[in-house]
Amino acid sequence: MMFSKTVEGDAIRIEISGQLDSMTAPELRPSFEALLQENPKRIVLDLSGLRLIDSSGVGAIVSLFKQVRAAGGAFDVVG
């Protein structure tokens, strides 16, 4: 799994590629926690590079979504 972050105006674009499953999803948690410390107004999550995602990966994304929305931010998923 590869993870990259790009700032685009008031949005932060996150690109995840490879596999997002029970083995790799826990690796995202520290990155997501650091991202939330930045108090982003908008997150764009680009999943176009994913070859595989399982329920653990979906759970990690849903967790991030809930935290961003609770802080008043917008959350978009593309790809």
Predicted region positions:
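Amphipathic alpha-helical interaction surfaces in cytosolic regulatory modules
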Residues: 19-79
